[in-house]
Amino acid sequence: MRYILLIISLLAISLPSLAQNNDPKIKRIEIVYGGEFTIDNAKYPGATIFKSDGNKVQFRHQGLDIWCNLAVLYEEKNLVIAHGDIFVQQGDTLQMNSQYISYNGNLKTAVAKENVVLKNETMTLETEELFLDRNTQEAYYNNFGKITDVENELTSKTGKYFITKKKNQFTNSVKIVNKDFVVDSQILDYYHPTGNAYFYGATTITGQDYKVYCERGFYDTRKEEGYFMKNATIDYDLKTLKGDSLYFDKKKQFASGTNNIVVIDTINNTIVKGHYGEIHKAKDSMFITKKPVIISLIEKDSMYMHGKKILVTGKEQNRTIRVFPDARIFKSDMQAKCDSIHSNEFSGLTQLIGKPVVWTGESQMTGDSIHLIANTKTEQLDSLKVFNNALVVEKDTLSDGYNQVKGKVLYGKFKKNQLKQIDFLQNTESIYYVYNDKKEMVGINKLTCSHIKLHLDEQQQVEKVVFITQPVGDLYPEDKLHKNDRKFREFIWRGDERITNKDEIFSEEEKKQQPIKIQGPKEPEEVDIEEAKLNAEQDEETSTETEK
């Protein structure tokens, strides 16, 4: 008799509520299994209380099932509040466990609390409070959550899960922990089927032998492969790579950069710049192009080397640098040009190959090939050698003539990175303009000697010429020496090619070059939208053609 009265009471509650809410779009929460049920209007006015009788209480609403130990159903509000050992299932898209859930059938929203665990076939989400919106198929938390999938453990203070897309959107103190790396980020999107992460704020990736920083980027956590932008930096292979756009592939041991790239090598005190560069760790090599320049710190001065391409190979302390073609050097007290530069750090030898020219002070130096030798211990310039057709030319300050010394071989000696002495050996000759104390021209001296030594002052100008062996020659009055005889056969004045500052190492054509336009990494839905737009445009064109 007591149970009959209870059923009558339930009908009395439910019938008015149905009359009040007759919106056909709103579906009622169904009682699949009620177990034991009671009414306590003092504690739960207008509600029915359902309790497990050994089998769990079960409710259903538009494809969502809720099992629990205890539930309070407000039929008028289309609201159920469940307690104790709760299990929720929505088709094959998600399963959820908790100790508390409040589900609103009118809004199709839920709040789950206490040891909340949400699962699907690709991931598990754990938190203490989770909000579920079935209209948008989204679940989100605001007070720390942990997500695990096949490869990674992800945590954040706040986060959202898009059930249909199988995508997480994390904000605030985001961390991805993998056995091979750790990601710390402000904001990121993560796709569980692929393991791809997209960054939208300050992000650091720390791997076993690399570290990445960016503020916009993409990372495949399964392949350790990524694309990074906005203040992007990669620390890899004892180098720091910066640029507008960076790419990294751990498996291939490869990193590259595009636009305004900078490679800092602290071991060798060098900086390399350009608009495209590659680092191949397995090959111990680095390749830079598109306005490349390598900057070496020499005491308090910097030396700039530029060519169309720069290739650096070899391990530290045994690197080889190749600069080609149209190679150029700028240093405050020395400049050079040639077809290519070949420099070896182990030997300290730098070779200038192909029509080389070196300027120091007011002097121009040419020959078939020029070698610069550095002291590998002090890393200072030590000496200079010019092989075959060595020629030093200095424009005369009081006339339109040129002072010249030539020989088969030239040896130069540096002191504190400044060229101080030049020795000419074998078949040496000189042409010098001679003046008296009143700076009046006395004549032009043409001499031949087996060994000539030049001493240079602080301004790198010739201050003294010494003939080591007895010279042979004459002093000619200016009007007695034909202009063609005032220059050696090898003479070419290349002063108009001289590089006067570090910006002039680039050709006029290179100065006009602009960085390429870079597009950021696109998420799958962005690609889908673009493809949909493209398909729509193609359909429209097809339709127009059909009408014609």
Where are these regions (language model features)?
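Bacterial N-terminal signal peptides
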Residues: 5-14
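Sec/Tat signal peptide C-region and signal peptidase I cleavage site
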Residues: 15-19
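N-terminal amphipathic/hydrophobic interface segments
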Residues: 20-548
